[in-house]
Amino acid sequence: MDYDFKVKLSSERERVEDLFEYEGCKVGRGTYGHVYKAKRKDGKDDKDYALKQIEGTGISMSACREIALLRELKHPNVISLLKVFLSHADRKVWLLFDYAEHDLWHIIKFHRASKANKKPVQLPRGMVKSLLYQILDGIHYLHANWVLHRDLKPANILVMGEGPERGRVKIADMGFARLFNSPLKPLADLDPVVVTFWYRAPELLLGARHYTKAIDIWAIGCIFAELLTSEPIFHCRQEDIKTSNPYHHDQLDRIFNVMGFPADKDWEDIKKMPEHSTLMKDFRRNTYTNCSLIKYMEKHKVKPDSKAFHLLQKLLTMDPIKRITSEQAMQDPYFLEDPLPTSDVFAGCQIPYPKREFLTEEEPDEKGDKKTQQQQQGNNHTNGTGHPGNQDSGHAQGPPLKKVRVVPPTTTSGGLIMTSDYQRSNPHAAYPNPGPSTSQPQSSMGYSATSQQPPQYSHQTHRY
């Protein structure tokens, strides 16, 4: 390239430090890099933005995948990539996003902490329904455009704070997303270990080579159960497995302890799973005779004859072929009964959740991790399984994930899916304050999480 042209191009390239004020406003940190809450220096608007600085120099395959997809995908419930900055001096990459003040990881944590403080505050029924509907709407859009998210978990479900998009769900962290319209090889051959353990579908744990959109639906079912109970439904001891083998005994054991062991008639193709022989060697069906989703949810006061439970059953169907689709789920009777889903998940009432706090440069995001994990494992008494400690966000609470190549997606013949219209309900009374909860720096928008958790559960770190 001509030297003079390079100099001219460099002088004209916009620099993130010239456009945005973000010093001292770090809200997330992890192996992927750093995330800052930022404002425009020129004062053209008063909006908050999220600046994600990618760790290292150049662009990783994961970052390339995320950028390629986000440049093509446009939907109210999928996070918007506004701009990409390339720093010529230090070869750093910056991604500019809309700023979301909340995420489901912190929202659920808030309600779990209220239970621990003996002042339980349940997530309002209408809020749970609105959250689920918008998650399904965003995933339906991705699936209609041939994209699997593959890493759905509460940390990657953002919720906008005060502003024009108040209470709007944003699905974030497309770093593990993949196109599935015409893969050159089965997806499992490229990277068999995907999705955070607790939200991983049973067919993944059994080594399925041709997994489908159903893996995202299972993860949504896990999130739905967590919204209803304030506890992760399939929490399990987390091991740092240095292998690409997707089989995970303890995670399967936890699923069977909740759901029961699948009958042959309920999942006929289970015998075709690569790890079926290992499954039959490690497990005995009669061990889980008294286990069922009905019994588990009844313990959390979710009635088996409720429409919410019926939808949960369809989302958490063991057989991926029989599992409901996002489009079918959005048409479920659950969403037709009062309270109806709203575009503002807070339904116009006061937002009780604290805003994110800034991290200091010296303050580690994983502060107190080991101590917390040891305490939790010491107190463990759930079906013989422990609880995972925080993993760095690059590993997303599971074995290392292989990076794979991806190209920008093509839209379906009808173009991009349009957003759904939401019915708006009248504002409800403000949420009661559950009293003091754990105080810690807030992580943000799929960014790296802090480690001090309410009792029982150390959760995954998260990224934008």
UniProtKB/Swiss-Prot annotation:
Q: Where in the cell is it found?
A: Nucleus
In terms of CDD domains, this protein maps to: STKc_CDK8 (cd07868)
Residue ranges of coiled coil: none
Q: Which intervals hold domain Protein kinase? A: 21-335
Q: What keywords are annotated for this sequence in UniProt?
A: Activator, ATP-binding, Kinase, Nucleotide-binding, Nucleus, Repressor, Serine/threonine-protein kinase, Transcription, Transcription regulation, Transferase
One family from Pfam that matches here is Pkinase
Per the UniProt record, which EC number(s) apply here? 2.7.11.22, 2.7.11.23
Q: Which domain of life is it from?
A: Eukaryota
The enzyme's first-digit EC class, named in words, is transferase
Q: Where is this region: Interaction with CCNC?
A: 1-15
Bias regions of kind Polar residues — which residues? 409-426, 436-464
Question: Which cellular component terms (GO) are annotated to the entry?
Answer: CKM complex; mediator complex; nucleolus; nucleoplasm; nucleus; protein-containing complex; ubiquitin ligase complex
GO BP terms in the entry: negative regulation of triglyceride metabolic process; positive regulation of transcription by RNA polymerase II; protein ubiquitination
Q: Which SUPFAM superfamilies match?
A: Protein kinase-like (PK-like) (SSF56112)
Q: Which cofactor does it need?
A: Mg(2+)
Annotated region Disordered: the residues are 358-464
Reaction catalysis annotation? L-seryl-[protein] + ATP = O-phospho-L-seryl-[protein] + ADP + H(+); L-threonyl-[protein] + ATP = O-phospho-L-threonyl-[protein] + ADP + H(+); [DNA-directed RNA polymerase] + ATP = phospho-[DNA-directed RNA polymerase] + ADP + H(+)
Per the record, where are the segments of Low complexity compositional bias?
373-391
Q: Name the principal localization, coarsely classed.
A: nucleus
Q: Which residues does the annotation say bind ATP?
A: V27, G28, R29, G30, T31, Y32, G33, H34, V35, K52
One GO MF term: ATP binding
Quaternary structure, per UniProt, is: Component of the Mediator complex, which is composed of MED1, MED4, MED6, MED7, MED8, MED9, MED10, MED11, MED12, MED13, MED13L, MED14, MED15, MED16, MED17, MED18, MED19, MED20, MED21, MED22, MED23, MED24, MED25, MED26, MED27, MED29, MED30, MED31, CCNC, CDK8 and CDC2L6/CDK11. The MED12, MED13, CCNC and CDK8 subunits form a distinct module termed the CDK8 module. Mediator containing the CDK8 module is less active than Mediator lacking this module in supporting transcriptional activation.
Q: What does this protein do?
A: Component of the Mediator complex, a coactivator involved in regulated gene transcription of nearly all RNA polymerase II-dependent genes. Mediator functions as a bridge to convey information from gene-specific regulatory proteins to the basal RNA polymerase II transcription machinery. Mediator is recruited to promoters by direct interactions with regulatory proteins and serves as a scaffold for the assembly of a functional pre-initiation complex with RNA polymerase II and the general transcription factors.
As for family, the record states: Belongs to the protein kinase superfamily. CMGC Ser/Thr protein kinase family. CDC2/CDKX subfamily.
The protein here is known as: Cyclin-dependent kinase 8
Question: What organism, scientifically named, is this protein from?
Answer: Mus musculus (Mouse)
